[in-house]
Amino acid sequence: MMYYLYSHAGINIFQYITFRAGAAFFIAFFLALLFMPRFIQWARNQKAAQPISEFAPQGHRGKANTPTMGGLVFIGATLLASLLCAKLNNLYVLAGLAVILLFGLIGLRDDAVKVLNHSNAGLSSRVKMLYLVLAGASVSAALFYFGMEDDLYIPFNKNPLLSMGIVAILFWTLVMVATSNAVNITDGLDGLATVPSVYALVSLSVFVYIAGHAGLSSYLLWPKITDSGEAVIVSAALVGALIGFLWFNCHPAQLFMGDSGSLSIGGFIAYMAIISKNEFLLFLIGSIFVIETVSVILQIGSYKTRGKRIFLMAPIHHHFEVKGWAETKIIVRFWIIALMSNIIALLTLKVR
C-alpha cells in the first residue's frame, strides 16, 4: 500500500526499499508489543499452554503453565506490516508471505493438537513432515515456474557451480524443510531461537538487497536476482515482530512461540537464503540451528548403533542444562556464537 503513495501520489520517499523496510520493521514491532499482552491473557484464560515433556530437565517444570502459540501474533504483525509497506504484485513478496503463512499454519495445527490433548506430542512426525514437504514444494514450484534463477552457487565463488533445472524444486524444498525443523529443535530455551533468527534474517536481508540491486550486485560480483530486493521488506517486518516478541520471550518467558512460530521462521530464513543464492552459506548464518540439529542426529545415531549417548541430553542446549549451566548463560553464549557466525558470513561478501 505504501508503495502506491509513490506511484499514484508522487511521494518520492515511498519508492525506496530501505525506507519501506524501516517502516515495516517499526509497524510490526509496535503491533507485536501492542497485541502480545492481550494474547498472553487470552491464552492463559484458555489454558493454551504446551505441556512440558517428562524427559525435559528438572528446571523446565516451572514453565508448565507458560502460554504458547506466540508465533500467531508475530506472524500476524509481519503479514500486516508487509501488506502496508511492500509491493503486493512482486513475486518474491508473495512467495515469502506464502512461506510464513503455510509453515505457520502447519505449526499452528501441531500446537493445537498439543494443547487440546494436554500432551507434548503433537502431529506425528510423518504427518508433519508431509505437510512441510507439500508447503515447501508448492512455493519452490511457484518460484521455478515464474523464472527464479536455478543456478547453484557456493561461497567464495562468483560463478555458479551448476544449473539445477527442475531438480531445484527438490533442493529448495529440502532447504526449507530442514531449516524449519532446525529452528524448531533450537526453540527449547527462553529466547534461544529468537535472537539467532533475528541475526540470520538481518544477514540474509543484506544479501537479498544486494542481489536485487543492479549496481551492488555487479560491484560485489553477486548473482543478480531481479526484483528480489522487495522481499527485504517482509524480512524487516519479521525482524521487528520478533524483537517485539522477545520483549515477552526473554527469560523468564511469559510466552513461547510454539511450532507456529519456529516453523514459519525457519521456512522464511530458508526462503531468504534461496532467493539470495546462499543455500550453502546458510550453514554459517544459521550455525546455532545446525549445531542443535547435528547434536540430535549424532545422539540418535550413536544410541541406535552403539547403544550409548554422546550427550547427557539432546538437543545440545539440554546437555549444558544437565551439566549445571544456568539457562541464561547457555542462551547468551549461543547468541554470541550466532552473532560471530553472521559477522563472518557478511565478511564473505568481499571474498569472491
UniProtKB/Swiss-Prot annotation:
Major site of localization recorded for this protein: membrane
The keyword Cell wall biogenesis/degradation is annotated on this UniProt entry: yes
Subcellular location: Cell inner membrane
Segment forming the signal sequence: none
Keywords, sorted A to Z: Cell cycle, Cell division, Cell inner membrane, Cell membrane, Cell shape, Cell wall biogenesis/degradation, Magnesium, Membrane, Metal-binding, Peptidoglycan synthesis, Transferase, Transmembrane, Transmembrane helix
Membrane topology recorded in Swiss-Prot or TrEMBL: Multi-pass membrane protein
Family: Belongs to the glycosyltransferase 4 family. MraY subfamily.
Name of this protein: Phospho-N-acetylmuramoyl-pentapeptide-transferase
Organism: Wolinella succinogenes (strain ATCC 29543 / DSM 1740 / CCUG 13145 / JCM 31913 / LMG 7466 / NCTC 11488 / FDC 602W) (Vibrio succinogenes)
